[in-house]
């Protein structure tokens, strides 16, 4: 019995890791069809990013690894912090406030259910 896995990664997406993790927690460990259903009915920016990434991981599993798409489930969802864009907002009396535009690195790993 071999535990083959398929992976898809997207880096430097303009969404904060904290907001992306809210969506990632919704479908971790679920079957692929259930996960897509959850993401399609979630009204968050991160859900659209995860839909693209999940479809890419499914394509990798079926085309590159010869896995059965109906048996796939989401084994691992990682949301790591990417590089931060630092900007400044001018304020009164010569001050400036820092603005951090955070980015995320997203990763999904799929496996077949036995």
From Swiss-Prot:
GO cellular component: cytosolic large ribosomal subunit
Record key words, sorted: Ribonucleoprotein, Ribosomal protein, RNA-binding, rRNA-binding
BP GO annotations: translation
Pfam family, one: Ribosomal_L22
Listed CDD domains: Ribosomal_L22 (cd00336)
PROSITE patterns according to UniProt: RIBOSOMAL_L22 (PS00464)
GO molecular function annotation: rRNA binding; structural constituent of ribosome
InterPro entries given in the database record: Ribosomal_uL22, Ribosomal_uL22_bac/chlpt-type, Ribosomal_uL22_bac/org-type, Ribosomal_uL22_CS, Ribosomal_uL22_sf
Known partners and oligomeric status: Part of the 50S ribosomal subunit.
Its job: This protein binds specifically to 23S rRNA; its binding is stimulated by other ribosomal proteins, e.g. L4, L17, and L20. It is important during the early stages of 50S assembly. It makes multiple contacts with different domains of the 23S rRNA in the assembled 50S subunit and ribosome. The globular domain of the protein is located near the polypeptide exit tunnel on the outside of the subunit, while an extended beta-hairpin is found that lines the wall of the exit tunnel in the center of the 70S ribosome.
PANTHER family in the cross-refs: CHLOROPLAST 50S RIBOSOMAL PROTEIN L22-RELATED (PTHR13501), LARGE RIBOSOMAL SUBUNIT PROTEIN UL22M (PTHR13501:SF8)
Family of this protein: Belongs to the universal ribosomal protein uL22 family.
Protein name: Large ribosomal subunit protein uL22
Organism of this sequence: Mycoplasmopsis agalactiae (strain NCTC 10123 / CIP 59.7 / PG2) (Mycoplasma agalactiae)
């Amino acid at each position: 019995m071999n535990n083959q896995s398929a992976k898809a990664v997207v880096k430097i997406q303009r969404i904060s890791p904290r907001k992306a993790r809210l969506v990632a927690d919704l479908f971790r460990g679920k079957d692929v069809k259930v996960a897509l259903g959850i993401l399609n009915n979630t009204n968050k920016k991160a859900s659209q990013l995860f839909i693209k990434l999940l479809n890419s991981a499914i394509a990798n599993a079926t085309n590159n690894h010869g896995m059965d798409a109906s048996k796939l489930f989401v084994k691992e969802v990682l949301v790591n912090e990417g590089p931060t864009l630092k900007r400044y907002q001018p304020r009164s009396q010569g001050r400036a406030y820092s603005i951090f535009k955070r980015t995320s690195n997203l990763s999904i790993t799929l496996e077949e259910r036995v």
